[in-house]
Amino acid sequence: IVETVPRRDHVVPVRYRDGRDWHQVLTAAGPDRVSGGQWEEAYAREYFRCVTGEGMLVWLFRDVRKGTWFLHGWWD
């Protein structure tokens, strides 16, 4: 689950849940947009590199077509 705030042409994550814990997003860089599907099912994603209140750097993305969010990874 990701909570967002609207921007001009996209939404920005401000908080996300990983399991039972909520994490505040202090800064979010993006979106980096990726799309395709000429020979397969079409897809469109928006990736954000985020810094949390705990100082973690995480990678979130939104499936634009479905509106669902995913924790893609993190850096340590």
Model features per residue range: what roles?
Residues 1-76:
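Non-catalytic peripheral regions of nucleotide-handling enzymes
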